[in-house]
From Swiss-Prot:
InterPro entries: Aldolase_TIM (IPR013785), RibuloseP-bd_barrel (IPR011060), Trp_synthase_alpha_AS (IPR018204), Trp_synthase_suA (IPR002028). It is an enzyme of class 4 (lyase). It catalyses: (1S,2R)-1-C-(indol-3-yl)glycerol 3-phosphate + L-serine = D-glyceraldehyde 3-phosphate + L-tryptophan + H2O. GO terms for cellular component: cytosol. Its EC number is 4.2.1.20. Belongs to the TrpA family. The gene is trpA. It comes from Thermotoga maritima (strain ATCC 43589 / DSM 3109 / JCM 10099 / NBRC 100826 / MSB8). The keyword Lyase applies. The active site is at residues 34, 45. Tetramer of two alpha and two beta chains. This is Tryptophan synthase alpha chain.
Length: 239
């Protein structure tokens, strides 16, 4: 099995359910989980994930509360924090304190959707930041990736916001990017079926699935969500 990263929005429908999901996913042997930090203006996300952000914010979920929850669990997969830039740089106790806490928790990297690759070097964040590549990313920008320290590269397989798609465009471009970079390449944005996962695995190192899992969380009673999410991940993995 190649790589598989699940996106789980923290605090949707509440942090206790998030904790149960993270523990339940541990049995599946996946590569990692992106923990989504809620934000009031999630410009890169589609309506399904935007709803999760708004519910979590109404629940009073903050990065600090997310870190407290993460400190209570132990998992075998890699953890990543996906957050817009504002909550990171405006962490109440200071950005350095946040980065120190992330390091203690073993979080492998930050995923910051509103931080373009060319701007990463201008932001004073001493932590591995996952770079984004899109179908319209220029070759000279792609080549910059080889000079950054990151756990993987996040390929956005569709223009615009996140959400489920029926097709897998840009396969040729994904292959070209894979040839140019040294880091593992994970493809996300729009993957919701095992057939799509298999197609990505043929040309990249792994997939990232978000909206398809958040939709499961949205459509099921709270006490059934962890089990239903695990079932969906198993389906995506072809288990």
């Amino acid at each position: 099995m190649k790589g598989f990263i699940a996106y789980i929005p923290a605090g949707f429908p509440d942090l206790e359910t998030t904790r149960k999901i993270l523990i339940a996913l541990n049995e599946l042997g996946i590569t990692g989980v992106e923990i989504g930090v809620p934000f009031s203006d999630p410009v890169a996300d589609g309506p399904v994930i935007q709803l999760a952000h708004s519910v979590a914010l109404r629940n009073g979920v903050t990065i600090k509360k997310i870190l407290e929850m993460l400190s209570e669990i132990s998992v075998d997969y890699d953890l990543y924090l996906m957050s817009y830039l504002n909550p990171i740089v405006n962490y109440p106790e200071g950005k350095e304190k946040l980065l120190d806490e992330l390091k203690k928790l073993g979080v492998k990297g930050l995923i910051i959707p509103d931080l373009p690759l060319r701007e990463v070097k201008n932001v004073d964040i001493a932590y591995p930041i996952v770079p984004f590549v899109a179908p319209n990313t220029k070759d000279e920008e792609i080549d910059l990736i080889n000079s950054v320290q990151a756990p993987f590269v996040y390929y956005i397989s569709r223009y615009g916001v996140t959400g489920e798609r029926e097709d897998l465009p840009f396969a040729d471009h994904i292959k070209r990017v894979k040839e140019r970079i040294k880091l593992p390449l994970f493809v996300g944005f729009g993957i919701s079926r095992h057939e799509q996962v298999k197609k990505v695995w043929e040309i990249a190192d792994g997939v990232i699935v978000g909206s398809a899992l958040v939709r499961i969380m949205e459509e099921n009673p709270k006490d059934e969500i962890p089990r239903k999410v695990v079932e969906k991940v198993k389906e995506l993995l072809g288990k």
